[in-house]
């Protein structure tokens, strides 16, 4: 149980942030909010940014989305670029949840690679997905293509899978195959399995059965059990002919 060892007005901003975090971890949300609200930007802009991000997260857990978006919106890039990036990502997710599609795009678009590579990658992935749902395929492709493996391997893998799917709908099979082929198991085993499954069918359509067999054979049970079973069925059917 967390108990402050001195009055709040005698604690530094960092100590109050730590106390707020401890309350949050213990599920004492009201106590966490009360402590975090005492931190001002004039005391320490960096810690203020961290406190507002945490406040937003707490309000989000409580379902108080208006309060959450208000807190995240107070995080300024110049105070703490990485915290700003994640606050903007959370804003985008919340705006999407409540149906503010233009505002989610704006929030995610505020995130730059230099703020946080990982936040940038997941924001670009989310942007791509949103543009896709709006039938803006060119914009979706542009967003997914912005993600590098060294930003975030998992986001890169799923972006490449989505790119391949987009190219397939545009009848650009070579581009689709290139995108799916770029995914490695160590990026994300599940995305890798889906990519190999798609590659198998793409090669089968092109009557490149050796390549199809290789792709399906690459899928392991631990990657994705259902895709593994499907790949084994496909291999059995191909080997019959």
Regions found by a protein language model. Name each.
Residues 1-15, 43-46, 79:
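TPR-adjacent "capping" and linker segments in tetratricopeptide-repeat scaffold/adaptor proteins
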Residues 14, 46-50, 86, 122, ...:
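Start-of-helix register in tetratricopeptide repeats
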């Amino acid at each position: 149980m967390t108990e402050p060892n001195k009055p709040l007005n005698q604690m530094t901003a960092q100590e109050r942030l730590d106390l707020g975090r401890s309350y949050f971890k213990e599920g004492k949300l009201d106590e966490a909010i009360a402590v975090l609200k005492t931190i001002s930007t004039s005391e320490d802009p960096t810690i203020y940014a961290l406190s507002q991000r945490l406040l937003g997260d707490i309000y989000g857990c409580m379902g108080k989305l208006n309060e959450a978006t208000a807190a995240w919106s107070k995080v300024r890039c110049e105070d703490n670029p990485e915290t700003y990036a994640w606050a903007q990502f959370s804003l985008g997710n919340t705006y999407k949840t409540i149906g503010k599609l233009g505002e989610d795009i704006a929030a995610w678009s505020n995130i730059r690679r230099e703020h946080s590579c990982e936040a940038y990658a997941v924001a670009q992935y989310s942007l791509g997905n949103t543009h896709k749902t709006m039938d803006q395929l060119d914009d979706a492709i542009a967003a997914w293509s912005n993600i590098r493996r060294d930003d975030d391997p998992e986001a890169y893998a799923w972006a490449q899978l989505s790119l391949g799917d987009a190219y397939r709908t545009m009848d650009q099979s070579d581009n689709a195959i290139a995108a799916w082929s770029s995914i490695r198991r160590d990026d994300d085993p599940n995305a890798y399995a889906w990519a190999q499954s798609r590659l198998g069918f793409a090669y089968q359509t092109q009557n490149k059965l050796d390549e199809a067999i290789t792709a399906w054979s690459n899928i392991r049970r631990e990657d994705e059990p259902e895709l593994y079973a499907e790949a084994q069925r496909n291999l059995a059917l191909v080997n019959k002919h």
